[in-house]
């Protein structure tokens, strides 16, 4: 006995989908579950067909049984099923299933092989493109994080030292030219002698010169720095105001 596909209703079903609750043939299974990633994660169980010979009926032991009763836990043929479950209303409520002789696989399988066959293999150019970022990341890890100092000076490379030296010479020449008109006017003529003392030196005085120098003594001021005292004088008339009268 075979189960018909619930989608095309033509080919025999080989897979039962637990999420869709449908029996599917191989072609319909690929078309439905390869549509998107969510459908590809559905749990499917394979249907393994047993031998074409059905077991015998547990009641008559003569005819092939294809009905299973859950409450009676027995395989029944069509005649025995009618005689038992149609007799009264209580037995008519028993749960009975069709025993097709097909066994469901214990482990869930996903039709990954069929999907991989339909997908094209990546070309060599794509494989090379995937390998290039891995190499670039490894090169970045090998590079040191801190910048290494340069073996040559920046000033020597750009010749800043030569520029500074020429600027200093130009400034000195320009300064000397500006001071020429001071010498022409006689500012630096006789006023500055060769024997003039530097500004930082203090002239030394001989003992004879010290005699003429009058010693300076600070004059004492007659004004005293003491605080003035205020004296209070009481007259004889004022003493009467401080006498307490005797009331006794």
UniProtKB/Swiss-Prot annotation:
Name of the protein described by the UniProt record: B-box zinc finger protein 24
Organism: Arabidopsis thaliana (Mouse-ear cress)
Compartment annotation: Nucleus
Tissue specificity field: High expression in leaves and lower in roots and flowers.
Annotated knockout phenotype: No visible phenotype under normal growth conditions, but mutant seedlings show reduction of hypocotyls length when grown under continuous blue light and a short primary root phenotype under UV-B radiation.
UniProt biased composition (Polar residues): 120-130
Recorded superkingdom: Eukaryota
Region listing for Interaction with COP1, in residue ranges: 236-248
């Amino acid at each position: 006995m075979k189960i018909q596909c619930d989608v095309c209703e033509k080919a025999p079903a080989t897979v039962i989908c637990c999420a869709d609750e449908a029996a599917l043939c191989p072609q319909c299974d690929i078309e439905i579950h390869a549509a998107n990633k969510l459908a590809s994660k559905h749990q499917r169980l394979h249907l393994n067909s047993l031998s074409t010979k059905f077991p015998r009926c547990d009641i008559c032991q003569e005819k092939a049984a294809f009905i299973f009763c859950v409450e009676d836990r027995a395989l029944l043929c069509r005649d025995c099923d009618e005689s038992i479950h149609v007799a009264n209303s209580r037995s008519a409520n028993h749960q009975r299933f069709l025993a097709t002789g097909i066994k469901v696989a214990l482990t869930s399988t996903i039709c990954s092989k069929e999907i991989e066959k339909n997908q094209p293999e990546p070309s060599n150019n794509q494989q090379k493109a995937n390998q290039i970022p891995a190499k670039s990341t490894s090169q970045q890890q090998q590079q040191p994080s801190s910048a290494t100092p340069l073996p040559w000076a920046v000033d020597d490379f750009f010749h800043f030292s030569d520029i500074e030296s020429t600027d200093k010479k130009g400034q000195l020449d320009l300064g000397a030219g500006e001071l020429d008109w001071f010498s022409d006017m006689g500012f630096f003529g006789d006023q500055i002698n060769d024997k003039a003392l530097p500004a930082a030196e203090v002239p030394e005085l001989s003992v004879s010169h010290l005699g003429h120098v009058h010693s300076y003594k600070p004059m004492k001021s007659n004004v005293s720095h003491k605080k003035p005292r205020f004296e209070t004088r009481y007259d004889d008339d004022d003493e009467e105001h401080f006498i307490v009268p005797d009331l006794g």
